[in-house]
UniProtKB/Swiss-Prot annotation:
It comes from Zymomonas mobilis subsp. mobilis (strain ATCC 31821 / ZM4 / CP4). The lineage of its organism: Bacteria, Pseudomonadati, Pseudomonadota, Alphaproteobacteria, Sphingomonadales. It comes from the Bacteria. Residues 693-748 are annotated as: Disordered. SMART domains: KH (SM00322), S1 (SM00316). Keywords: Cytoplasm, Magnesium, Metal-binding, Nucleotidyltransferase, RNA-binding, Transferase. Mg(2+) binds at D484, D490. Belongs to the polyribonucleotide nucleotidyltransferase family. This is Polyribonucleotide nucleotidyltransferase. Its EC number is 2.7.7.8. It is an enzyme of class 2 (transferase). Disulfide bonds: none annotated. Residues 699-736 have a biased composition (Basic and acidic residues). Signal peptide: none annotated. The keyword Transit peptide does not apply.
């Protein structure tokens, strides 16, 4: 019934298994990949025909984590997997980016890749396994695919690289780097690093590429056993048509790409392309698409030739020059921190908001619930490129760009112990002509500094490009949108003066050598240093204090055995503290208490209240208190947060008090001295030895009572004679009839 094919390899000391032929047999290609006890199923399907008028490759990748994979049931009202989470979206992009360039030009069949995590052991991360499974499924499907690719994650600790580190190892690692690559070329890099030098980053990429070679070999072996017949790809001889397009458009395209302003250049290109419609009025839809593709190739040829032969870029810059930069902080008056960062025709308006611990992002996933205190959200409205388009919930691109900027800034943030705030950075791209994610990094850094967040060091980011031909290559600093589209590499680097914090690379062609990558990193280092210098003109260092509009957060510690006293039964005490003082109070299991309010006086009031609860009263010390209950023999006074003591009627005044309520009332503020604390913790207080106006201690001039140890004096014990033993007592039924109860009498 099943024709199962399997490949097993030892990969970094663990067994990696690729299997096909048992599950999802109706898909064009399906593979179950297993590493440890983590299992990912990936299935590939593709449409057999192309939709009419389609001129692009519609590849869709979906990655999904099943809660059942980790033995969990989804939280909340809906008990099933719902829309893609941010993590699932990011991993979908991680799978998409290295495989998309490997589909041949002209293949426009709709293709769907679905990767699902079916089992998760908490040790082997499923994202790398999903990339491998997707590559293997494509290799088996027969769909035109110039792969396969392999994937690997690299950590770095104590000067050593770690292949596919566990979650525990990643927490201690200075690097989290993911590489997707073919046998001969690196296609994709995604990383976060703790300010590592360029040499370490380059060696990490090389280590990953070498380490994933056994995976590629296993996929090839599996494909030799189980791959379907390859699809035929329709090709056209467009040499004559290409010559005609070049004849009609070359001069106008060349003039357009000498215009340095984007809007003028776009208008000129539109007019130049209008000539093609007039020249080919009888062209059918398919032929029109081919003409448009040839025109795009001609544009690329003009731009690439100018860069390689003349060293001239679209906007007139040389290869290393960064566009003019203008930075401004405090741009928005009511935010906690803000910055407007403009680089050429790319602009980001970024704000920072500080909040308390209850504003942390709750994330529910395979590893359970956890909370994130740093959030970065990136928005790309259509007006930023002068277009009409969808505006609303963030798309995959916005989520991906936001995460890239998050990785760049995250390593330089202070620890929660040093800066106990929840931090949200919001970046709105108001203009875009390339490298908007790196503008978010620069603007986000300035907004954080403006908000008073004590960063380790400022961070800047730059996008690099590459033009690669057989006779040479050129590396471009701070690429524009057109250079991104017409070039061969998008290489984003962010970091401090000390080292790299984030690196993302997407390569569209094979042949990127280690020499090219090394030169790109060195050129990016110079660009980042220049940008840091320009940023420092707006704000050279972190503000010494946070904004007056931001909440103040202070911490204190209480003994663990006192936590329940601070919280109170059903949270009664802590709710009273919050309601009375106006400060938020958060208590952790280790006894750490965080007090927050926009008014420092509220924080101080809450601190004093909590200190009053956890501190032990001291005999002989004077405290401020409040009468909470009046009884016949005195009054109960709350004098230390939740601590009450008794002021006996004799300790209210030196003179006799006949009725306590004549002197005191509930809610009255009084000053008391602690006289005694018994072995049960009950406290005896006195008001009469304290000046109720000043709080000063008074001399106790009242003479002590005689025989004070026994109120009312010693009374003689009445002698009732020897006590009878119980056996001497007459039984109830032996009582005299006249004294016995009626129901015991014999005559009753």
């Amino acid at each position: 019934m099943f024709d199962i094919k399997r490949q097993e390899i030892d990969w970094g000391g663990k067994k990696l298994t690729l299997e096909t032929g048992q599950v999802a047999r109706q898909a064009d290609g399906a593979v179950i990949a297993t590493l440890g006890e983590t299992v990912v199923l990936c299935a590939v399907t593709a449409a057999k025909t192309v939709k009419e008028g389609q001129d692009f490759f519609p590849l869709t990748v979906h990655y999904q984590e099943k809660y059942s994979a980790a033995g969990r049931i989804p939280g909340g009202f809906f008990k099933r997997e719902r829309g893609a989470t941010e993590r699932e979206t990011l991993i979908s992009r991680l799978i998409d980016r290295p495989i998309r360039p490997l589909f041949p030009e002209g293949f426009y069949n709709e293709t769907l890749v679905i990767a699902q995590v079916m089992s998760y052991d908490g040790e082997n991360e499923p994202d790398i396994l999903a990339m491998i499974a997707a590559s293997a499924a494509l290799a088996l499907s027969g769909v035109p695919f110039l792969g396969p690719i392999g994937a690997a994650r690299v950590g770095y600790q104590d000067g050593e690289f770690i292949l596919n580190p566990t979650l525990e190892q990643l927490e201690k690692s200075d690097l989290d780097l993911v590489v997707g690559a073919t046998r001969d070329a690196v296609m994709m890099v995604e990383s976060e690093a703790n300010e590592l030098p360029e040499e370490v980053m380059l060696n990490a990429v090389s280590f990953a590429h070498e380490s994933l070679q056994p995976v590629i070999k296993a996929i090839i072996n599996l494909a030799e056993q189980a791959a379907k017949e390859p699809w035929e790809l329709v090709s056209y001889d467009d040499s004559a048509l290409a010559a005609k397009v070049e004849e009609l458009c070359y001069d106008n395209f060349d003039k357009a790409y000498r215009l340095t302003r984007k809007a003028e250049r776009v208008d000129a290109l539109s007019k130049a392309k209008a000539v093609l419609d007039e020249a080919f009025p009888e062209a059918d839809p398919t032929e029109k698409l081919r003409i448009q593709k040839l025109a795009k190739k001609l544009e690329a040829k003009i731009v690439r030739t100018a860069i390689l032969k003349e060293g001239r870029r679209i906007d007139g810059r040389d290869l290393k020059t960064v566009r003019p930069i203008r930075s401004q902080v405090g741009f928005l008056p009511r935010t906690h921190g803000s910055a407007l960062f403009t680089r050429g025709e790319t602009q980001a308006l970024v704000s920072t908001t500080l909040g308390t611990a209850d504003a942390e992002q709750m994330i529910d996933g395979l590893t359970g619930l956890h909370y994130e205190r740093f959030m970065l959200h990136y928005n790309f409205p259509p007006y930023s490129v002068g277009e009409v388009g969808r505006f609303g919930a963030p798309g995959r691109r916005e989520i991906g760009h936001g995460k890239l900027a998050w990785r760049a800034l995250h390593p330089v943030l202070p620890s929660k112990a040093d800066f106990p705030y929840t931090i949200r950075v919001l970046s709105d791209i108001t203009e875009s002509n390339g490298s908007s994610s790196m503008a978010t990094v620069c603007g986000g850094c300035l907004a954080l500094m403006d908000a008073g967040v004590p960063l380790t060091r400022p961070v800047s980011g730059i996008a690099m490009g590459l033009i690669l031909e057989k006779d040479g290559f050129a590396i471009l600093s701070d690429i524009m949108g057109d250079e991104d589209h017409l070039g061969d590499m998008d290489f984003k680097v962010a970091g401090t003066e000390k080292g790299i914090t984030s690196l993302q690379m997407d390569i569209k062609v094979a042949g990127i050598t280690e020499e090219i990558m090394q030169k790109a990193l060195e050129q990016a280092k110079g660009g980042r240093a220049h940008i840091l210098g320009e940023m420092s003109k707006a704000l050279g260092e972190v503000r010494s204090e946070i904004s007056n509009l931001a909440p103040r957060i202070e911490t204190m510690s209480v003994p663990k055995d006192k936590i329940r006293d601070v919280i109170g039964t059903g949270g009664k005490v802590i709710r009273e503290i919050v309601a009375t003082t106006g400060a938020k109070v958060d208590i952790e299991d280790d006894g750490t208490v965080r007090l927050s309010s926009s008014d420092p006086a509220n924080i101080e009031a809450a601190r004093e209240w909590i200190n009053g609860i956890v501190e032990e009263p001291e005999v002989g010390k004077i405290y401020n208190g409040k009468v909470v209950n009046i009884v016949d023999f005195g009054a109960f006074v709350n004098f230390m947060g939740g601590r009450d003591g008794l002021v006996h009627v004799s300790e209210i005044k030196n003179e006799r008090v006949n009725k306590v309520s004549d002197v005191l009332s509930e809610g009255q503020e009084v000053k008391v001295k602690v006289l005694e604390i018994d072995n049960r913790g009950k406290v005896r207080l006195s008001m009469r030895v304290v000046d109720q106006e000043t709080g000063a201690e008074l001399d106790d001039n009242r003479p002590p009572r005689e025989n004070a140890e026994r109120r009312g004096g010693e009374r003689p014990r009445r002698d009732r004679g020897p006590r009878r033993e119980s056996g001497d007592r007459p039984a109830r039924r032996d009582m005299e009839p006249e004294f016995a109860p009626a129901f015991l009498r014999k005559d009753s």
